[in-house]
Amino acid sequence: MTCDESLYRQYLSGDDEGLNALMKKYGDPLTLYIDGYLHDVHEAEELMLDVFAYLFTKKPRIRDGGFKAYLYKAARNMALRHKSKRKPLFSLDALADEPDGRLLAEEVIRTEERNRILHFCMDEMNPDYREVLYLTYFEDMSYAQAAEVTGKTVKQITNTVYRGKESLRRLLEREGITNAQS
């Protein structure tokens, strides 16, 4: 049993500190993951709270070693449901946020600029590639955990990670980021 499962069991046995610890640990990363679907951090924060509210009220049984995958799968399902119900909005502010695409070489060297470019390229990627790369690299999930979250097989995750990395490499090269600058 991992630390997450023991904290969840602690909560199930009546100690709210277990759930508080899980919310501290996963609140921000889960919000970022949900924001990848909704592209609205405020809605993502609300949905993250809904995920934990679901755990709080339903108290589902979660198999050993599967808490993180269960949490992200629940977040994914809620985000997709929420996104399908949401009305499309057009915002003039969003147009002002568009990157100009022309970056000077000296700006690229700075970490903040490279991170901005990385996020820009990730946003342009196929959503399946983006999700699997996010889960495996940013959330440090195994391929098996990512497969459980997305409902795919481990082989499909392996292929998607490979294709996603190739796609990201091409997008980064287009923006002037190469392996030599990493």
Where are these regions (language model features)?
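Sigma70-family region 2
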Residues: 12-13, 39, 49-66, 85-87
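Arg/Lys-rich amphipathic alpha helix in sigma70-family domain 2
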Residues: 73-92, 111
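N-terminal module of bacterial RNA polymerase sigma factors
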Residues: 1-29, 36, 123, 170, ...
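Acidic, proline/glycine-rich intrinsically disordered inter-domain spacer in sigma factors
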Residues: 95-123
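A short pre-motif secondary-structure segment
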Residues: 132-136
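DNA-recognition helix of helix-turn-helix
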Residues: 80, 144-174
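C-terminal flanking helix
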Residues: 27, 31, 52, 126, ...
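Short, small-hydrophobic-rich alpha-helical interface motif
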Residues: 11, 30, 34, 44-55, ...
